[in-house]
């Protein structure tokens, strides 16, 4: 999907960076921010000190705006838990309410790919922090340690992007746009879009930049 978005931005003449990163400055994280991350980890059932990114991978960077594509796996109960953080009351994110709703609605879609061992269990870091996961598909007990780490990492990206002075836009497959008189999902529109659809999508992205 990001490849198609890259082509749309390029065709529209946008000045942007694709598949880039920014380096985290740990000194920007104050006591309040550390508290938000520690509490987020605890709410997900994590133990120990919270891990902090050294660099954050970004799909697109346009000026001081970062754009990330969130795939189906993102939208689950654990990401929903992170959205309860006081951080989201302190900072405004345009995607917040929509993403909260998607987490409540589309967990079954996350399960279609997310029960794979590498995703459900996650990395050794995931099991160290959250413990040994339950069987794939079973949310009792520990549940999905890999999913939990992913949710925590997204909380971390939201916070770190803001304290580094960036605006963050998160795109989802489930966003709907009006085209040719009907609503279509973003992921469907990005499959071989026609010229007029590419132009419409470019305009839509530019409006999101504000």
Q: Which positions does each model-derived feature cover?
A:
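Nucleic-acid endo/exonuclease domains
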Residues: 1-210
């Amino acid at each position: 999907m990001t490849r198609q978005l890259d082509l749309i931005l390029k065709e529209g003449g946008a000045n942007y960076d694709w598949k880039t990163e920014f380096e985290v400055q740990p000194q920007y994280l104050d006591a309040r921010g550390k508290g938000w991350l520690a509490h987020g980890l605890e709410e997900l059932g994590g133990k120990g000190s919270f891990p902090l990114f050294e660099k954050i991978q970004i799909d697109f960077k346009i000026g001081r705006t970062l754009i990330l594509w969130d795939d189906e796996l993102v939208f689950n109960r654990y990401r929903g838990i992170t959205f309860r953080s006081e951080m989201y009351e302190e900072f405004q994110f345009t995607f917040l309410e929509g993403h909260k709703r998607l987490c409540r609605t589309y967990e079954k879609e996350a399960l279609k790919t997310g029960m794979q061992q590498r995703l459900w269990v996650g990395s050794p870091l995931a099991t160290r922090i959250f413990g040994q996961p339950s069987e794939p598909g079973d949310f009792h007990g520990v549940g999905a340690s890999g999913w939990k780490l992913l949710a925590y990492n997204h909380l971390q990206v939201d916070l770190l992007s803001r304290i580094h002075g960036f605006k963050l836009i998160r795109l989802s497959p489930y966003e709907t746009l009006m085209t040719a008189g009907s609503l279509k999902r973003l992921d469907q529109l990005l499959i071989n879009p026609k010229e007029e659809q590419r132009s419409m999508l470019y305009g839509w992205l530019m409006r999101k930049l504000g």
